[in-house]
Amino acid sequence: MKVWFPAALLAAIMAALPPPLAAQWPLHPQAGVPKGADGKPNLNAPFPRTADGHPDLSGVWDIISARNLEPNGPPPGRPPLVRGGDILGAFKDGLPIQPWAAKLRENRTNSQGLFDPDGNCMPQGPVEYHIDPQPFKIVQTPRQILYISESNYGLRTFYMDGRRLPEMGSVPPYWHGYSVGRWDGDTLVVESNNFHGVDPDNVDAKDLPDIFRSAGWLDHKGAPYTEELKLAERFRRPNFGTLEIEVTVDDAKAYTKPFTFRIIRRIVADGSEMVEYICHENQNFLKLTAPRR
């Protein structure tokens, strides 16, 4: 049974754990890891390439403390860096958020993550996986790239076979959206739409099923997105040990204009793998809530 914690507390606990405790699995020597003179992984070495010449993004990518990264702000012309599970904190002037969405985010934050999808065995939002304290794994092939999160074993598929992104509403909405990818030089560009988001017309309904209260979480603070969300992600591997993800959120129902931010992850180079993660649904203890005094 999965014990529920407020999302912020869970993120702090996971971030504080050393890798062997946060994701423990039998170690197996990892091939292709460049080593320095001291025999340790050289994370600043050049990134590997696949047989077709593209950057190889494969591997397990873990959270990295962004506290000391870019203390003076992002480089000129670059989007802000998200630190932790709160996207709002990356923007000095706040998010360009619609009034109803700001109210919903506040309610979700004040509930201390009661309806956070991860705490309710529901799929997280696609951006939540990027900022989650648990690792994710990328499996890269020429025709598909699989993005697998350790959290609830969330799976996203990036189709690389040249297909076009379907029209909005032409396919059923998906928790992880429908994603197609292409290479722009050494950058993987992924575009996604047809998400299962929150319905702004029903956010105040008292009898709304919990499954819908857990829909459309952009981050751990509950910044919402609707089924109008169009997501653009740019994955770049500047060196062996670093994965930089640039995300643009375009959702006119929830935000007054598109906005862009970055996340940085670090390769797991010690042979660790993701652990099996099973979350049991219909957890009765989630119903044992009472007003906080």
Identify the residue ranges that each predicted region occupies.
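Classic N-terminal secretory signal peptides
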Residues: 10-12, 16
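PEST-like low-complexity, intrinsically disordered acidic/proline/serine-rich tracts
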Residues: 3-6, 17-293
